[in-house]
Amino acid sequence: MSKVWSFQRWLIAFFMAFLSVSYANASDQVQNQETAKSKGKILVVMTNHSAYPTRSDKTGLWLTELTHFYDVAKAAGYDMDFVSPQGGVVPLDERSMKPIYVDKSARKLLADRQFMYRLNHTLAPSSIDPTHYKAIYYTGGHGTMWDFPDNKELKNISESIYRQGGIVSAVCHGVGGLLPLVGEDGKPLISGRTVTGFANKEETLSGIKSQVPFSLQNSLINHGAKYKQGFLPFTSYVVSDDR
């Protein structure tokens, strides 16, 4: 994952497709205070997994795949809850913390005590009521490959949000969280739908191919998805199909 992500463009494209963006007046009295009139809640999913099989460095959440989304969603008037498969602390991928990747937005949130408290005290899936959310967003980072696909509680939450008319979305390796989802017809939710996600060639180029438990690209295709990827690796690429 050694690259510079263009997630601001990705996020703008995503929200142009799915959300009507309107900027609310934020209070100057409390740092990081949620907008006064919320348009609803988004459930943001993050990994608890930090260990590679043989590498000494640690994986986890790729930081800006959270921070860029957080900034855009908050500016659009949405509240967010943070959840992880086990609840509690979310590890940060070591490489995502390098200066080349940590931009102004990420630095600001890293210095925000309230934001960091939430990152270190994420909710457990058992505490989530899906009816409270208009969308669910799976963040990325290699850690998600271990604890997103097999989590039955997150699966049930996502399916409930979708069936009540909500949006199911993901970025990068977080797309693995969509693999177990099943539609009302009993078929994989992504079957027949256009999706994207971290590509095989990107795993090879990033040097992590031998570490991950499965190929995300192959698994998406095996679940019936119409997999698409950008012409160049590690560049901004977004697709949407229904919600």
Label each region the model flagged.
Residues 11-22:
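Bacterial N-terminal signal peptides
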Residues 27-164, 176-243:
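Extended, subdomain-level signal for the structured scaffold at the beginning of enzyme domains
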Residues 171-174:
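Short, thiol/selenol-centered motifs that function as redox-active sites or metal-ligating centers
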Residues 167:
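Active-site cofactor/cluster-binding pocket
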Residues 1-11:
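Bacterial N-terminal signal peptides that target proteins for export
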Residues 3, 25-28:
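Intrinsically disordered, low-complexity polyampholyte segments enriched for Lys and acidic residues
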